[in-house]
Amino acid sequence: MAKYDKADLERRMHGAVESLKHDLAGLRTGRANAALLDPVTVEVYGSQMPLNQIASISVPEPRMLSVQVWDKANVGPVDKAIRSAGLGLNPIVDGQMLRLPIPEMTQERRKELSKLAGQYAEKARVAVRNVRRDGMDNLKQDENKKEISEDERKRHETEVQKLTDATIAEIDAAATAKEKEILG
């Protein structure tokens, strides 16, 4: 049974790109985006819960987030969780609604976030290269077991390399676009 599976490699590489896009969406760019609050967890009902499971998040204005807490008892913990999340956001409590004005970013903060976007991209590139290495190793094992010929192995290795190059180009494009967005 051949170990090489091109569809599996494509799926895993695509997963690395999707993970990067999710990470980049969470970086604050000066514009309101509900994904900013994805990493926020709130201590309620005796456990940590993601904010989006105890409140609805909307973007009423370009520089304002709105968090509608469903249970009035959770307003305090939600306020505390957002303030302590390290996002630089200070909620204004209005009943069960929290308004989060998005402050202007300093040039220093923009550079930090740009650097972080680069780190996320590098993490995704490493993941893609690891998938590539797994694919190449599987091809060599298949050839050693005489399941594929040397010519087939070389042809598949070329396919894997093309897939890797295309995926890394996609990662670079996403990271570059995000860095431009952050730096203004």
From Swiss-Prot:
Protein name: Ribosome-recycling factor
CDD domains for this protein: RRF (cd00520)
UniProt keyword annotation of tRNA-binding present: no
Protein family (similarity comment): Belongs to the RRF family.
GO process annotations (BP): cytoplasmic translational termination
Keyword Ribonucleoprotein in record: no
Gene3D superfamilies documented for this protein: 3.30.1360.40, Ribosome-recycling factor
Compositionally biased region (Basic and acidic residues): 133-162
Highest taxon in the source lineage: Bacteria
Chain's role: Responsible for the release of ribosomes from messenger RNA at the termination of protein biosynthesis. May increase the efficiency of translation by recycling ribosomes from one round of translation to another.
One CC-aspect GO term: cytosol
GO molecular function, a single term: ribosomal large subunit binding
Disordered, as annotated region: 133-163
UniProt cross-references to InterPro entries, sorted A to Z: Ribosome_recyc_fac (IPR002661), Ribosome_recyc_fac_dom (IPR023584), RRF_sf (IPR036191)
Keywords: Cytoplasm, Protein biosynthesis
Compartments (UniProt record): Cytoplasm
Classification via Pfam families: RRF
